[in-house]
From Swiss-Prot:
It comes from the Eukaryota. This is 4-dimethylallyltryptophan N-methyltransferase easF. Pathway: Alkaloid biosynthesis; ergot alkaloid biosynthesis. Its EC number is 2.1.1.261. Keywords: Alkaloid metabolism, Methyltransferase, S-adenosyl-L-methionine, Transferase. 4-dimethylallyltryptophan N-methyltransferase; part of the gene cluster that mediates the biosynthesis of fungal ergot alkaloid. DmaW catalyzes the first step of ergot alkaloid biosynthesis by condensing dimethylallyl diphosphate (DMAP) and tryptophan to form 4-dimethylallyl-L-tryptophan. The second step is catalyzed by the methyltransferase easF that methylates 4-dimethylallyl-L-tryptophan in the presence of S-adenosyl-L-methionine, resulting in the formation of 4-dimethylallyl-L-abrine. The gene is easF. It comes from Arthroderma benhamiae (strain ATCC MYA-4681 / CBS 112371) (Trichophyton mentagrophytes). One of its GO terms (biological process) is indole alkaloid biosynthetic process.
């Protein structure tokens, strides 16, 4: 039987990320085209709405990831070095990663799994849901902070920095970045987490190759996505009120728009005024969002084989293994540093 001690949550925040969000909101709404920052959508309530949305029957990325993990987790676990620090960059979907953790335990790999998340309460829920008493070889902990906080922690923490590292990027996380920023982000991960032990350290990520507009848009308009999108406006109001402002947004004034961009090969999610120009509340009362003007808040890039090859190459990485299943557009890739 495993340890009865509850897993620890380590606060690795170098600053409170919430404090920067109002400035990011203002900058995005003053830009052209207008945007909203990703952090605005990941309040505790926002994450809960997203989890409900991702469990909808039409949301194929999650279902395909789980199918592949159930079938291939043993082989994935074999590719992770014994003694590794496994950091899950976005831990909301325990129902996915549990298959890999169970395979690591069955292989008697002595690893420590760190769930990283922006939400302390979501981390608490994640850790409470793990049947830790069923694990002897796999240990559990959590990191409260951003991606950047997690990478800095890996690079600077004594003992941790000298162990092999495996970074998990499930949930098509890398698809949320523009193609150039995705390569920069992967390169940043490599420079912080892979270079100390390049032969044993790796990134394990998922990418989606589906460019069928009907399948993609159906997935991203599935049940739960509208509450997820509108929750960001409520969270924004809370943050601006803490700074002495008023309700900047009225969620009733907006609707959610889902589109496929044929040119860029990506899904685009936006919030749009319902029926009139919208003047925002103080302190953004000088900003007007025009009727039908799109305020984009999310993209999901899809990768064909050439785009995937370019992504990994630009990041200075090579895919050493991949896992998928027949009929699935999603695949898992294990990336390592290119040899010098």
């Amino acid at each position: 039987m495993g340890s009865i001690n509850p897993p620890q949550i380590l606060d690795i925040r170098r600053s409170k990320f919430e404090e920067s969000i109002p400035k990011q909101v203002e900058a995005g709404l003053l830009s052209s085209p207008k945007t909203l920052p990703a952090l605005l959508f990941y309040s505790t309530e926002g994450i809960q709405h997203w989890n409900r949305h991702s469990h909808a029957s039409d949301f194929y990325p999650r279902h395909e990831e789980i199918q592949i993990l159930k079938d291939k987790a043993t082989d994935m676990a074999a590719s992770i070095a014994d003694g590794s620090v496994v950091v899950d960059l976005g831990s909301a979907s325990l129902d996915k990663v549990i298959h890999l953790l169970e395979a690591l335990e069955a292989a008697q790999k002595k690893v420590t799994y760190y769930a990283l998340d922006l939400s302390f309460s979501e981390l608490t829920s994640t850790l409470q849901a793990i049947p830790t008493d069923q694990f002897v070889h796999v240990q559990f902990s959590a990191l409260h902070g951003t991606f950047d906080d997690g990478l800095q922690w890996l690079k600077e923490t004594p003992v941790i920095r000298d162990q092999p590292h495996c970074l998990l990027l499930f949930g098509l996380t890398i698809g949320n970045f523009s193609r150039s920023n995705a390569a920069k982000f992967l390169h940043n991960i490599a420079s912080h987490a892979l270079v100390e032990s390049p032969s044993q350290s790796s990134i394990l990520l998922t990418l989606d190759s589906c460019k069928v507009p009907t399948k993609v848009t159906r997935a991203y308009t599935a049940e739960g996505v509208v509450p997820f999108a509108l929750e960001s406006l409520k969270y924004g109001n809370t943050l601006f009120q803490q700074d002495g402002g008023e309700n900047v947004f009225d969620p009733e004034d907006w609707y959610f728009l889902s589109e496929w961009n044929y040119v860029l090969g990506r899904h685009e999610a936006s919030l749009v005024p319902r029926s009139k120009d919208i003047k925002l509340g103080r302190p953004l009362d000088k900003i007007v969002v025009g009727k039908h003007e799109k305020v984009r808040f999310g993209c999901s890039y899809k990768y064909d084989s050439e785009e995937r090859k370019e992504l990994f190459g630009t990041a200075g990485l090579r895919d050493v293994k991949s896992w998928s299943k027949e009929g699935c557009d999603v695949a898992f890739y294990q990336l390592k540093c290119c040899p010098n």
